[in-house]
């Protein structure tokens, strides 16, 4: 196979990996945790993965502590947890 063909194959495999959704067996366990605003009093929009609805939802994050199932963007939540 030529080097151009190898580069094309590598590019297609990389694109497939990026676009393939996370399967439930590959999903991090913290994606099962409930939304946790934490003890602080900030009012930040954040997102968490809801395993019952199998989607990412908005919630108000206080700005500290909480748990790892807290994302700044819905895209980050989907990329990490959504199947």
Curated annotation (Swiss-Prot):
Under the heading SMART domains, the entry gives: KU (SM00131)
Provide any one GO MF term from the record.
toxin activity
Q: Which residues form the BPTI/Kunitz inhibitor domain?
A: 31-81
One Pfam family from the record: Kunitz_BPTI
Please verify whether the record's keywords include Transferase. no
Top-rank taxon, per record: Eukaryota
Cite a GO CC annotation.
extracellular space
UniProtKB keywords: Disulfide bond, Secreted, Signal, Toxin
Signal peptide extent: 1-24
Question: So which tissues is this one expressed in?
Answer: Expressed by the venom gland.
Where in or outside the cell? Secreted
Q: Which family does it belong to?
A: Belongs to the venom Kunitz-type family.
Function (record text):
Serine protease inhibitor homolog that only shows inhibitory activity against MMP2.
Can you say what this protein is called? Kunitz-type serine protease inhibitor homolog mulgin-1
- Record the organism: Pseudechis australis
């Amino acid at each position: 196979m030529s080097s151009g063909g190898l580069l094309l194959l590598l590019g297609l495999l990389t694109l497939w990996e990026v676009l393939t959704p996370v399967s439930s067996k590959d999903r991090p366990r913290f994606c099962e945790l409930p939304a946790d605003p934490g003890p602080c009093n900030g009012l930040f929009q954040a997102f968490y993965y809801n395993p019952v609805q199998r989607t990412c939802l908005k919630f108000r994050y206080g700005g500290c502590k909480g748990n790892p199932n807290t994302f700044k963007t819905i895209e980050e939540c989907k990329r990490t947890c959504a199947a």
